[in-house]
Amino acid sequence: MTQKRRNNGRNKHGRGHVKFVRCINCSRAVPKDKAIKRWTIRNMVETAAIRDLSEASVYSEYTIPKLYIKLQYCVSCAIHSRVVRVRSREGRRIRTPPPRVRYNRDGKKVNPTAVAKNL
């Protein structure tokens, strides 16, 4: 039988069984090593209330704590919500993560390779 991926779409190497997690979108049971995982980091307080909190705070340099949320998707929901994209047969072999889009202070896109050359 032909093999679509080198890791069979999983990260289970050498383990017999892996516990299941639930997809946050459809609640499907997905093996933990197969689930597509993403972290979102948000402020605990919405942006409109940050200024009010800083004015009312006794501490001058109080940093508002952040929420670290782990999102776990099944493969079909991750593709549907464009968390991951379908790649060609040659593209699937590329194991390096895609280049991240960076923005400068003006809000313009910055090419990461050009920035690395300047340093």
UniProtKB/Swiss-Prot annotation:
One GO biological process term: cytoplasmic translation
Task: State the GO CC annotations.
Answer: cytosol; cytosolic small ribosomal subunit
MF terms in GO: mRNA binding; structural constituent of ribosome
Record flagged with keyword Repeat: no
**Would you say which domain of life the source belongs to?**
Eukaryota
InterPro entries named in the record: Ribosomal_eS26, Ribosomal_eS26_CS, Ribosomal_eS26_sf
Q: Carries keyword Metal-binding?
A: no
| Disordered: annotated segments | 88-119
Where found?
Cytoplasm
Question: Where the protein is mainly located, per its record?
Answer: cytoplasm
Q: Which UniProt keywords apply?
A: Cytoplasm, Ribonucleoprotein, Ribosomal protein
The family note in this entry says: Belongs to the eukaryotic ribosomal protein eS26 family.
Other remarks?
Answer: There are 2 genes for eS26 in S.pombe.
Quote the subunit structure annotation.
Component of the small ribosomal subunit (SSU). Mature yeast ribosomes consist of a small (40S) and a large (60S) subunit. The 40S small subunit contains 1 molecule of ribosomal RNA (18S rRNA) and at least 33 different proteins. The large 60S subunit contains 3 rRNA molecules (25S, 5.8S and 5S rRNA) and at least 46 different proteins. eS26 interacts with eS1 forming part of the mRNA exit tunnel. eS26 interacts with TSR2.
Q: What does this protein do?
A: Component of the ribosome, a large ribonucleoprotein complex responsible for the synthesis of proteins in the cell. The small ribosomal subunit (SSU) binds messenger RNAs (mRNAs) and translates the encoded message by selecting cognate aminoacyl-transfer RNA (tRNA) molecules. The large subunit (LSU) contains the ribosomal catalytic site termed the peptidyl transferase center (PTC), which catalyzes the formation of peptide bonds, thereby polymerizing the amino acids delivered by tRNAs into a polypeptide chain.
**Name of the molecule in the record:** Small ribosomal subunit protein eS26B
Which source organism does the UniProt entry give?
Answer: Schizosaccharomyces pombe (strain 972 / ATCC 24843) (Fission yeast)
| Organism classification | Eukaryota, Fungi, Dikarya, Ascomycota, Taphrinomycotina
